[in-house]
Amino acid sequence: MAIVNHTLGFPRVGLRRELKKAQESYWAGNATQEELLTVGRELRARHWQQQKDAGVDLLPVGDFAWYDHVLTTSLLLGNVPARHQNEDGSVDLDTLFRIGRGRAPTGQPAAAAEMTKWFNTNYHYMVPEFTKGQQFKLTWTQLLDEVDEALALGHKVKPVLLGPVTYLWLGKVKGEQFDRLSLLQDILPVYQQVLAELTKRGIEWVQIDEPALALELSQEWLAAFKPAYDALQGQVKLLLTTYFDSVSQNLETIKALPVQGLHIDLVHGKDDAATLSAQLPANWVLSLGVINGRNVWRADLSNWFERLQPLVGTRDLWLGSSCSLLHSPIDLSVEVRLDDEVKSWFAFAIQKCAELSLLSQALNSGNGQALEAYSAPIRARRTSTRVNNVAVAQRLAAITAQDSQRQNVYSVRADAQRERFNLPAWPTTTIGSFPQTTEIRGLRLDFKQGRLDGNNYRTGIAEHIKQAVAEQERLGLDVLVHGEAERNDMVEYFGEHLDGFVFTQNGWVQSYGSRCVKPPVIIGDVSRPEAITVEWAKYAQSLTDKPMKGMLTGPVTILCWSFPREDVTRETIAKQIALALRDEVADLEAAGIGIIQIDEPALREGLPLHRSDWDAYLAWAVDAFRLNAAVAKDDTQIHTHMCYCEFNDIMDSIAALDADVITIETSRSDMELLESFEEFEYPNEIGPGVYDIHSPNVPSVEWMEALLKKAAQRIPAERLWVNPDCGLKTRGWPETRQALANMVQAAQRLRETQ
C-alpha cells in the first residue's frame, strides 16, 4: 500500500501571466483564437511536466480554465444564459467569454454573469444561473479534450470535475422562483455521460470536487448527495474531494456514499486524520491534504511525518495539497530580490509539489531524516528578529477594553461633528480613489525603477492631487478626497509602509478571468515605523476649505488580502495592524484631518465557512476596527466603506463597528441592501452608493434622485449621504466628471424639495 501523492489543481495563468496576456490580446482583436488556444496548450503541457518533474504521481487534468472552472462546468452542462446564446445553440470559446465579460452574440452589451468569491478565498467564480424547466446536455468537451492531450503526452492523470451538488449550491435561480435542487436529476445524465467517456479512455480515478461538504449544510442539501452519487457510481473510481474546512459535521452523509475515496483538508480543517480514518469504510482511499494550497509558507514536513506515520499501513493513503494550488504563486526560484532568509521560509506551487514528493517518499520508506534539513528554516524562523518584535508584543498585551471605545456614543459625536463641519443635507462625497491615468501609473513606475528621483516624484504626485481637488471643487462636492494618485493598490501601499510585510516580483495569483493580484506576505509582527498617509492628506487639505477625508485600508481587509502568517492567529495579526493604523488615525487628526475613512470591504469575506464559528470571528474583526478607530476625538468623523456585501445576517456586527458613517454598494441591487439597515434600525449615518462605478455608463440625474428617494423611505434623510458605489480608480475622467456632476445635481434637487 504505497502512498500516492497528487495535487488537486495547479495555477493556470503561467509564470509570466501568459494566459492573461493572451486573453486580453484576443479580446482586443490583436490575436487569433488559434494563437490563444496555442498558449493554453503550451501552458498545460508545461504545468503537467513541472508537476511530474517535481515528483507528483497523479496529475490533475481539468483544472485549467479559460476564465473560471465553475463557468467551464456551466458550459460542460450546456448551461448558457439566453442572453449569451448563439442562435444555433452551439457553444464555443466566445460563448464562454461573453458570459464572463458581458456581451451578446451580436457584440452588444449584455449583463455578465454575477461574480462572487469562491468560498472564503480571494478567487472569484461566475455564478451559474438556473431557470425553471431548464434543459442540460453535454455541449463543451474541454475536459475530455484536455484528458486526451495529457494522455498523448504519456502522463498518468486524474481528471477533475466539479461535483453536481456543489455546482447547484453555487448557482442562483433567475426568473420564476423554484428549488434549484430539483435540477439535480436533469444534470446527472450529463455527468454520467462524461464519466462514461473517461472510462473509455482508460481513466482509473476521477477527482470529483464537493467543497460544499465543508459547510454546515441543511438536511435538504445533505439529502441530495446519496441519490446523486448512486447515479454516478459504477464507472470510474471517484475520489470525493473536500477542502477549505473540516467535514466531520457531514461525516454520516459522506460515509453512505458509493465512492472509492475521500480527500480532506488537514490544513484548514479541524479533523483528526486517525479518528476520521477509523470511521470510514476500510476499502476507501483516504487522501490527506497536508500541503497548504492557499499560502506561500514552506511546510514543516518533519511535523507532518510524525503526525502521519502511525496511519501508514492501516489503509490506502494518498497525500495531496489541501486544495488546488490555484491560490498559490507558481515558482519561488524566480524571486531573485527576496533575501535568502525570507526566501527559505517560502514554497510556491512547484515547491509544494516537491514537498508532496519528499513527504510521500519519507513515509513510504519509514525514514524521515531527510525532512529534518528541509524543515529547519521554518523552525529557525520562530526565533528570527524579522518575525518577533518585543515592542509589538508588549503593546498587544497592554490592550484594554477601553482602547476600543470612542469617547462618547454616536448621538453625542454627531452633534460635535455637525457643529464642526456644518455640512448641508444630503452631503456629497466620493469613496476615495480617482482615475489612475497612464500618466499617474507612469510616474509611479519611473520612481519605482529609479528613473525619477524622490523630489520630482513628489512634485508630480502633488500636481495630480491638486488637479483632483480642483475637479471636486468645480463639481461642488461637499467632502473631498485627495484621489490616491500615490497608491498602486489599497493593500500593497500600506504593506510597503509597515514593518512585517514583504513583496514578491512574480507572486501572481488569479482573482478572476484575466485579473491577477500579487498579495503581500505578512512575515512577522506588524508595526508602523513612520506616518504613511499624513503628508498627502495634509497637503490636499491645504488646497481647500472643505473637509478632506483621510483614507486608510482597514486591518481586516489588509489581513484578508495578504498571505498571512501561519504561526499566530488571524486575530493577533489583525490587532497588530489595527494598532499600527491607530497611530495613523491619531497623526491624521493631529494634522487637522477631521474626517477619516477606514475601508473594510473584506469584513464579510473573512467569515469562516462554518456558521457556528462566525461569532468568534466577528467579535475580533469588529474589535480590530474599533481598536483602529477609537483613538479619534468626538468631532472627528470616522467613515467606513464596504462593497459586494450582504448585510442582513451580520447587521449586529456592522452596527458594532460604531463608524459614524458607512458607505455601501447598493446601486446594482436597486437599494435592496438598505432593507437590512431599515429592519435593524441602524442608528448611524449611511451613504448608499447611487451609481455603479464598475460600468462606464453615466447615470442620469433623475435615476440617482429616484434611488435616493427610495433610500429615504428606509433611512431618515438627515442620516443619508450621497456617493458612488466604490472608488473611481478604474474609470476615465470624462465619465467620472459627468457622473459626479449628475450626482451633485441630484443631491441639490433633493435639498430644494425638503
From Swiss-Prot:
Signal peptide: none annotated. Pfam families: Meth_synt_1, Meth_synt_2. CDD domains: CIMS_C_terminal_like, CIMS_N_terminal_like. Its cofactor is Zn(2+). Its EC number is 2.1.1.14. L-methionine binds at residues 431-433, 484, 599. Binds 1 zinc ion per subunit. One of its GO terms (biological process) is methionine biosynthetic process. GO terms for molecular function: 5-methyltetrahydropteroyltriglutamate-homocysteine S-methyltransferase activity; zinc ion binding. 5-methyltetrahydropteroyltri-L-glutamate binds at residues 17-20, 117, 515-516, 561, 605. Zn(2+) binds at residues 641, 643, 665, 726. It catalyses: 5-methyltetrahydropteroyltri-L-glutamate + L-homocysteine = tetrahydropteroyltri-L-glutamate + L-methionine. Pathway: Amino-acid biosynthesis; L-methionine biosynthesis via de novo pathway; L-methionine from L-homocysteine (MetE route): step 1/1. The active site is at 694 (proton donor). Belongs to the vitamin-B12 independent methionine synthase family. Catalyzes the transfer of a methyl group from 5-methyltetrahydrofolate to homocysteine resulting in methionine formation. This is 5-methyltetrahydropteroyltriglutamate--homocysteine methyltransferase. It comes from Pectobacterium atrosepticum (strain SCRI 1043 / ATCC BAA-672) (Erwinia carotovora subsp. atroseptica). The gene is metE.
